[in-house]
Amino acid sequence: MNETTLRLLLERVRSGELAIDNAVNRLRELPFRDLGEAVLDSHRELRRGHPEVIYCAGKTVAQVRTIVAAMLEGEGDILATCATSEMAEAVAELSPDARYNPLGRTLVIRRRARPPTATFIAIVTAGTSDQPVAEEAAETALLFGNRVERINDVGVAGLHRLLARLELIREARAVIVVAGMEGALASVVAGLVARPVIAVPTSVGYGANFNGLSALLGMLTSCAGGVGVVNIDNGFGAACLASLINQP
């Protein structure tokens, strides 16, 4: 339930259109709903501006299906991250509107039309191998109502590729930079644009990359100001922060 839905509910009670007992039934499950194996945070959108997101890693197909089924009884959009194709198939049986992005491993059910923001979030990847994380960020940002511009494969090994897209990147309200290896792209971008840069280290790279640790440390020790760093492969977290910056 979001603020708009809550206001409409109260207006219906005030006008006599909705009986008080019916309104109480609608509100009874606030602020959470206990499903046994999971407890849905029904107030998440009211507090944060977006509904609870399902993190599928470690969950079974049956658990994801149960959670989605419960969320479908509400009115909000639904996003699941780190979802498998088997989970997507199970959810598709519940809703024909379910859309699966196999690259980003995201599952989206959009139930409310909202115009995208006039300003946009730029999502910049160092290499094609970083795109799964970037797609998770893009799908999250789009569902939260943001306009998104994807700028792929412009890493520091070919800096001219980045410079060719610099004008577009500078127009963004916030920039998400997704990079593995040594993670240098975040510092380079932050040195060229007057916008907040949200750096996402990825686990892409050979041995001494340590599954993203080298990129994480490189981004944390960036000499360029205005860089914020999220956890390794956390495209979702980067999109949440970028959305807060981009939304009016």
For each predicted feature, which ranges?
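Long amphipathic alpha-helical segments
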Residues: M1-A88, E93-L94
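Short glycine-rich or small-residue beta-strand-to-loop segments that form or flank ligand, phosphate
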Residues: V53-I54, I78, F120-A126, V175-V177, ...
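Short glycine/serine/threonine-rich phosphate/pyrophosphate-binding segments
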Residues: A62-V64, D130-E135, L159-H160, A179-V189, ...
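Glycine-rich oxoanion-binding loops at beta->alpha junctions
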Residues: T106-R110, R147-L168, L213-S214, V230
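Glycine-rich phosphate/diphosphate-binding loop of Rossmann-like nucleotide-binding domains
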Residues: A118-H160
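C-terminal binding/interaction regions
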Residues: T125, L166-E167, V204-P248
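Glycine-rich phosphate-binding loop
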Residues: A164-T202
